[in-house]
C-alpha cells in the first residue's frame, strides 16, 4: 500500500535537510561554529525521529506495529537505502580519486587516502570515523538507518516488547557514559555504534505517532477545534529548542558533531538534540499550509535523499571557488540555498531517467 504523507512531516524534512547542508557549508573553526553545528546535529535528529514516527505506517490504518514481513522490510531497505548508498558511494569514490588531491590541497591539507581501492573498501565498511569516507561522509546516515530500522523491527516483534523498548531507550545513555569514562571509541561496520546512540530518537518518534494521528488536521495545515491548545504545545517545543541552544552556548560547547564520541559535553547531547528536533517539528507547522513557501519546503522534504547524497559536490565546489571568503552565517546560508537548488535540478533530471538512484520506483519518481 502507498505510504501516507502528512504536510507537517514533509515540511520538517525540508527544514531539517537545509540545516544539515548549512552545517556542512560552515567552517568548523569559524566564529559561528556552535550555532551551525547545532543546526546540523539537530537536523539529523529530526530524520531519526521521523523515521520512527513513519516506520511501517500505511494508508487506512495507524498501527503501533503492523507485523510487516521481514522480506518486505528487507526489500524496502535495499531499494530506499542500501542501493542508493552503493550507487552514490561508487560515484563519490571515483570523483574523489580524480579531484580529491586538488580539493584537499586547497581546503584540508591533512586529508589523505585518495586511492580508489582503499576507499571502495571503506565504502563496504561504511563508517565515517574510519578515515576512508572522506569522499562523501554524509552517506553514513543511510547505512546507520538500516541498522536502526532492523534493530527496532526485531524489537517490536518480540513478545517482551515493553521491556525491550525500555532497554532500547536507556542503553545508549549507559553506552555513552562508559565510552566517555574509558575513552574507548568503537568504529563498527555501517555505523553500528552510532545506530545504538540514536535508538532513543527513533523510539521517541514511535511515541510521536499517536500525537500525529490525533492531530492529523494540524499536520496538514487545517484548522481544527483544539487549535489554541496545539499552538501552545508547538510554541513550547520551539522555546525548548531555543533553550537547548542557549544551554550549549552557556556551557561553552565547542564541538557539536552528531556523533556522540566527538561531542565534548555528553550532558548536552541527548537533551539538546531531542529538544532541537522537536523544535524543528514545531516550526514546520508554519509551512504545512497551502502557501507558496510551504509548498516549496514540502517539495524539498519529499526529496531529501537526493539532497543528502549529492550536496557534497556543490558545497565543495563553492568552497573552492570562495576559499578566500569571509566567514558568516549569511554566506553559508547562500551556499546552502545554491547547493539545495542544484541538487533539486539534478534530481529532477535523474528521476526521469533512472529513479532507482534515489530509491524510487518508476511509477512514483516524484517523491521518496
Model-derived features: positions:
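Alpha-helical transmembrane segments and their immediate juxtamembrane cytosolic regions
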Residues: 2-368
Amino acid at each position: 500500500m502507498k505510504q501516507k504523507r502528512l504536510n507537517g512531516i514533509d515540511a520538517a524534512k525540508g527544514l531539517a535537510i537545509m540545516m544539515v547542508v548549512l552545517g556542512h557549508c560552515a567552517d568548523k573553526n569559524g566564529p559561528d561554529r556552535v550555532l551551525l553545528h547545532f543546526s546540523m546535529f539537530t537536523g539529523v535528529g529530526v530524520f531519526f525521529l521521523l523515521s520512527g514516527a513513519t516506520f511501517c505506517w500505511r494508508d487506512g490504518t495507524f498501527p503501533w506495529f503492523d507485523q510487516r514481513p521481514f522480506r518486505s522490510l528487507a526489500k524496502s531497505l535495499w531499494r530506499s537505502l542500501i542501493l542508493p548508498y552503493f550507487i552514490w558511494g561508487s560515484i563519490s569514490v571515483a570523483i574523489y580519486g580524480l579531484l580529491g588531491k586538488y580539493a584537499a590541497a586547497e581546503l584540508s591539507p591533512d586529508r589523505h587516502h585518495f586511492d580508489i581501492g582503499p576507499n571502495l573498501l571503506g565504502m563496504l565498511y561504511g563508517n565515517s570515523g574510519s578515515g576512508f569516507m572522506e569522499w562523501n561522509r554524509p552517506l553514513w546516515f543511510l547505512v546507520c538507518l538500516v541498522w536502526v530500522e532492523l534493530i527496532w523491527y526485531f524489537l517490536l516483534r518480540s513478545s517482551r516488547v515493553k521491556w525491550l523498548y525500555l532497554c532500547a531507550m536507556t542503553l545508549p545513555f549507559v553506552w555513552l557514559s562508559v565510552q566517555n569514562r574509558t575513552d574507548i571509541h568503537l568504529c563498527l561496520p555501517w555505523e553500528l555504534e552510532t545506530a545504538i546512540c540514536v535508538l532513543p530518537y527513533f523510539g521517541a518518534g514511535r511515541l510521536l505517532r499517536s500525537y500525529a494521528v490525533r492531530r492529523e488536521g494540524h499536520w496538514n495545515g487545517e484548522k481544527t477545534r483544539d487549535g489554541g491548545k496545539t499552538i501552545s504545545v508547538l510554541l513550547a517545543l520551539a522555546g525548548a529548542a531555543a533553550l537547548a541552544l542557549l544551554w550549549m552556548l552557556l556551557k561553552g560547547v565547542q564541538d557539536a558533531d552528531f556523533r556522540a564520541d566527538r561531542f565534548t559535553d555528553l550532558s548536552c547531547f541527548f537533551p539538546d538534540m531531542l529538544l532541537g528536533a522537536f523544535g524543528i517539528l514545531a516550526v514546520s507547522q508554519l509551512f504545512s499550509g497551502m502557501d507558496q513557501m510551504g509548498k516549496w519546503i514540502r517539495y524539498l522534504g519529499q526529496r531529501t535523499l537526493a539532497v543528502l547524497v549529492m550536496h557534497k559536490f556543490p558545497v565543495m565546489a563553492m568552497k573552492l571557488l570562495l576559499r578566500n571568503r569571509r566567514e558568516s552565517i549569511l554566506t553559508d546560508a547562500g551556499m546552502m540555498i545554491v547547493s539545495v537548488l542544484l541538487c533539486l535540478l539534478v534530481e529532477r533530471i535523474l528521476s526521469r531517467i533512472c529513479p532507482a538512484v534515489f530509491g524510487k520506483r518508476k511509477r512514483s519518481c516524484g517523491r521518496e
